Amino acid sequence: MGKLFGTDGVRGVANQGLPPELAFRLGRAGAAVLAGKGDRVRVVVGRDTRISGDMLEAALVAGICSVGGQVLKVGIIPTPAVAWLTRDLGADAGVVISASHNPVADNGIKFFSASGYKLPDPVEEEIERLVLAPEDNLPRPVGVDLGRVKEVTEAPERYIAHVCSTAGRGLAGMQVVLDCANGAACRVAPAIFQRLGAEVSLLHNVPDGTNINVRCGSTHPESLQAEVVARGAAVGLAFDGDADRVIAVDEKGQVVDGDVIMTILALYRQEQGGLPGGQVVVTVMSNYGLHQALTAAGLRVQQTRVGDRYVLEEMLKSGAVLGGEQSGHIILLEHNTTGDGLITGVQLLQVMAATGRPLSELAAAMPRLPQILVNVRVGDKDAAMASPALQAAVAAAREQLAGRGRVLVRPSGTEPIIRLMVEGPDREELENIMAGLQRVASGL
C-alpha cells in the first residue's frame, strides 16, 4: 500500500489525518486521472451521515470541478449504492465519503471505477503520486470549462428499486427489525423491506451526525438481539455505518454472522440447482464450520487474505458469484460489484420465505468451532507485528493447538489495531491462550 491509499481507500481522522485540503487534492487528482484523454469526467459522489461529511464532500466536489469534472451528487446513501449508481448513471467514476464501521471522528474517501469496482492499484498509485507531488500542474480551466454539480435526487429511489428487483418473492407477514446504525441505511433500508411487504420495526434510525455506529449496528448487535426477542420478530438485520455489511439475528436472539449467512445462501442455491461457479470465496478468518458445511454439499471453498478487495479479486479470477467475510461484508456478484448489506439481507430473507424455515434452523446447517476474536489497539501496528515477543507467543500458541485449531494474528488495514483470533474445540483452552496473547500484544 502507498502512503495515502490503504485497503479501503484513504482513511483518517477527519480534519486531521484527512483534512479538507487533502480531499480537495484527491478530487483534483482523481478526476484528472480518471478522465484520461476523453471528455469531461462524470463522477458520482455520495456519503454517510458523519458530521465531517459536509466538509469533506464540499472540498472533494470543489476539487473535481476545478479540473473541469462534472459531479453527480447522490447525497447520504450506502457505499454499495454509489458503486451501483456509477454504472447505472453511466458515470466515469464514483466516490464515497465514509469510514464504514469506524468511529465518528474517522472518515474516508474511496473511489470506484466506471464498472463499479474499486480502482486497480496502478490507478490509485497514479492519483497518490499527483496528490503528493511538490507542485500541482493539473489543469485549471476557467469560465464555461469549469465543472458543474448536479443533484441526482432520484438516486435513492433508483437504488431501492434495484435492490427490490433482486427479490423473487415478497415478504408479506414477516416481522423484521432493522438496526440502521444511524448511518447511510436509514432512508433506504426501511423503504426496501416495506416495499417487499415485511412488517418493519426500526432501531437507531435517527442520525444526528455524531451517533453513527455508537453502540449500534453490525458491530454492536446487543440492542437488536433484545428487540427481536421482545417483539417476537422473525429476524433482525444490523447494518454498519455505510451499509456495506450486515449481521442477522434469529428469532431466538442469537447472532447470525457473515459465515453463517454465506453458508445459508450457498446451500440454498446449491439445492435449487447449483451455485454458479460451484464455490464460495472466504478469508482466513472464516470459521472452519463453514468449510465443513459447504464441502459436504459438494461446494469448493477458496481462502484469501483478510479484506474484501482480496475476496473480490479471487471471485473475479475463479468465476465465483458469492464471497465475503465473517464480519458480514458479503459480495453477491450477480447483483452488485461490492459488498452490499441491503442486497445480502434481502437474499437471506428470501431463503427464509422460500423454505418457510426459521432462521435458527437454517443457521444450524453450519457447525461452529469455538472461536475468539480480540482487537488490541497499539501505537505502531507494523512494529507490533514484528515484535519478537508477539511472534514467540504466537508460535507457542500454534504449537499448543497443532492439528486441533488455528491461531491468526494480523494488523487492521484501516486502524492502529492488531487483530487476534484463536479457534479450536475447547473454549476454556482458547480463553487461556487468548489471555496470554492479549497480555503480550497489549504491552507493545
Curated annotation (Swiss-Prot):
GO terms for molecular function: magnesium ion binding; phosphoglucosamine mutase activity; phosphomannomutase activity. GO terms for biological process: carbohydrate metabolic process; peptidoglycan biosynthetic process; UDP-N-acetylglucosamine biosynthetic process. Mg(2+) binds at S100, D240, D242, D244. The keyword rRNA-binding does not apply. Binds 1 Mg(2+) ion per subunit. Its EC number is 5.4.2.10. Keywords: Isomerase, Magnesium, Metal-binding, Phosphoprotein. The keyword Glycoprotein does not apply. Activated by phosphorylation. HAMAP family: GlmM_B. Catalyzes the conversion of glucosamine-6-phosphate to glucosamine-1-phosphate. This is Phosphoglucosamine mutase. It comes from Moorella thermoacetica (strain ATCC 39073 / JCM 9320).
